[in-house]
Amino acid sequence: MNVETIETPSLGDRSYLVHDGEVALVVDPQRDLDRVLSAADDAMVAITHVAETHLHNDYVSGGLALSRRTGATYLHAAAEVLPFDHRGVGDGDVIEVGSLTVRVVATPGHTQHHLSYHLTENGDGKGAGAGALFTGGSLLYGSVGRTDLVAADLTDTLTRLQYRSVRGMIDSLPGDTRFYPTHGFGSFCSSSQGGDDSDGTLAGERSVNLALTIEDEDNFVERLVSGLSDHPAYYAQMSPMNRAGGIPVDLSPAAPVDPTELLRRIHRGEWVVDLRNRRAYATDHVVGTIGIELDDPFATYLGWLIPWGTAVTLVDDTAEELVEAQRQLARIGIDRPAGGADGGPDVWGKDHDRASYPAIT
C-alpha cells in the first residue's frame, strides 16, 4: 500500500492518494483537482474510488467533480441526505479497491455522521499489514477535530461522541496502525494545535492525545469546549456548498483591470486587495486598497473578513501571485475574482493617490 500526501498548507489540510500500484482511492480531495490528477499520473494509477470523511466546514470539496471526471465511485456517509450520485456507506461496510480492503468506521464527533476509513492489504489487518487509518476531522495528531461547527446546541453531544469515537478506534485497531488526518496542520477545524509529539501511530497517541490522557468524559468535554477559539466566518458557507455537491472550479486567469477601472472600483468602496508583503504595502500602496499578504493564511483571513458574496479585485507585482491567490480563494468557494492587475503600484497605481505607513525594523 502506498500513501501519497497532497498538502494544502494554506488551509492546514491534507488529502491522500492511496494505491496498490494499479488503482487508487482518494480521501478528502480539495477543489483544485490538477494536483490530485498529477499525483495519480505520477504513480501511474487509475482513481477508482473517492471517499469523504465528512461534509467539510473549512473548504469546498472536489470529491464530486473528481468522481465525475474519473468515473470513480464516490463514498459518503449513508446517513447524509445528499442530492448527487454517490455510494452511501456506514460502519462496518467493506469496499475493495484493487488489492486493498477498505473498512468503514463510524467516528461521529467532528460532525454527526463522520466516517474514518481503515485500509489494509489483502484484508489481513495483521502485523506489518495493520494498515492505514484515514481519520479526517476525528483523531488528529495530538488532538481531535473541533466539535462546535455543526450547531451550538449540538456541541456537548458531539464532544462526547468525539471522545468515544477516538477511544473506540484506539481500542479496536492494532497499535501500529498509522493514521492520516485531514485536519490539524494549522486548520481551524482542529480543537487545539498539537502533533509535535505524535509518531503517527494509534499506540503513540495514547500518551499525547487529550482524548486519551483524560480518563473522565465530563472533564474532557469541559477542557475541549473551554479551549475552542473563534473560527473563520466563511465556515458557515462551506457545509451547505458541500451538501449541494459543489461545482467544478474555474482557475482561468481573472479579467485584467486597467488603472482607470481600478480607481473607479476603489471610489465605489469595492474590495481591492493588495497581495504584496506587508513591508512593501507599508512602504507604498494605493489609497483605498486593502493589504492582505499572500502567504499561507491568506484565504482564511480574507474569507474571515469579507462579507460573503462581495466582489474582490486582486492586485500584485506578478501575474503568478494573482494565479496563486485565485487558487487559494477557490478552495473556500470564492470562485472568480472580479479582476486582477499586476506590475506593481507604479503600473496599476499610476496617477492614483499613494500612501505609506511608518515601519519599525
Residue ranges and their predicted role:
Residues 32, 63, 68, 72-74, ...:
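Hydrophobic, small-residue-rich alpha-helical packing segments that form membrane-like cores
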Residues 146-148, 203-237, 246, 252, ...:
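Rhodanese-like catalytic fold shared by cysteine-dependent sulfurtransferases
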Residues 29-30, 55, 79, 111, ...:
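Active-site metal-binding loops of divalent metal-dependent hydrolases
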Residues 33-75:
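Active-site metal-binding motif and surrounding structural segment of the metallo-beta-lactamase
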Residues 1-46, 117-120, 125-136, 142:
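Conserved beta-strand hairpin/beta-sheet module of binuclear metal-dependent hydrolase folds
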